[in-house]
């Protein structure tokens, strides 16, 4: 999620939006496998699995894909997925947070080191970058499903803190993490199509970059986003 960066031009935003669609599919499948590993393959007795299956259907993942991965998740050969967070500083003092979901932390760590060796930056101790960000809930809403003035009114009434534009096709409704489920439910009740709800990081302060550092950071972020296990990359570049 690039945020409001002067470096994120239209072409870059479009490429990232297209790439993000594939990431959503991949993340849901990993969440499904993790839910089965933790609570079993029966959605009737596994509330977490029920929620993930519903999310999969909302994102038009075919039933055969869901069934195939449910079967895959019950295999002893399939490892569980773990959530991992990496903090690093990019060029010009920009903070970057990388969230990944992986079944092999050594592989993911190796991919992170390769990205940094190729594009610069430095991994730092946990907490060194996080304090520059706030944890928020976010709901992606299709612009085609609801008018901007209407969604703003409903979102604020539902408990949202802000309404943003995620890309050309979607709004992004921001709220406190504890309000995410309630906000999503109320928006859906008003006809909005919510394709994804998740927790994100929003920068509390922005770092201004010169052109050289800005372009170098974009190259680093693009590389990080291409890592298979990585789900989201956040930064505080203005």
UniProtKB/Swiss-Prot annotation:
Keywords in alphabetical order: Cytoplasm, DNA-binding, Transcription, Transcription regulation
Keyword Transcription regulation applies: yes
Region (Disordered), start-end ranges: 1-20
Residue ranges, compositional bias (Basic residues): 9-20
Family, similarity comment: Belongs to the TACO1 family.
HAMAP family: Transcrip_reg_TACO1
Name of this chain's protein: Probable transcriptional regulatory protein CPn_0573/CP_0176/CPj0573/CpB0595
Native source organism of the sequence: Chlamydia pneumoniae
């Amino acid at each position: 999620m690039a945020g409001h960066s002067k470096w994120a031009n239209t072409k870059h935003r479009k490429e990232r939006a297209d790439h993000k669609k594939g990431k959503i599919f991949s993340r849901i499948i990993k969440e499904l496998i993790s839910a089965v590993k933790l609570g079993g393959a029966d959605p009737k007795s596994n509330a977490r699995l029920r929620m993930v299956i519903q999310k999969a259907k909302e994102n038009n993942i075919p039933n055969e894909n869901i069934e195939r991965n449910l079967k895959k998740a019950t295999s002893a050969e399939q490892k569980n997925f773990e959530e991992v967070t990496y903090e690093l500083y990019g060029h010009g003092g920009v903070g970057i947070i990388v969230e990944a979901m992986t079944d092999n932390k050594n592989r993911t760590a190796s991919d992170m080191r390769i990205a940094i060796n190729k594009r610069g930056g430095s991994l730092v101790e946990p907490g060194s970058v996080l304090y520059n960000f706030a944890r928020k809930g976010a709901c992606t809403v299709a612009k085609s499903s609801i008018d901007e003035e209407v969604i703003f009114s409903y979102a604020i009434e539902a408990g949202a803190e802000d309404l943003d534009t995620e890309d050309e096709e979607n709004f992004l409704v921001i709220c406190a993490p504890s309000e995410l489920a309630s906000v999503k439910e109320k928006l859906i009740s008003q006809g909005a199509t919510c394709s994804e709800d998740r927790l994100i990081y929003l920068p509390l302060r922005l770092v201004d970059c010169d052109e050289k550092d800005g372009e170098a950071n974009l190259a680093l972020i693009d590389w990080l986003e291409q890592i298979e296990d990585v789900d989201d990359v956040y930064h505080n570049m203005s």
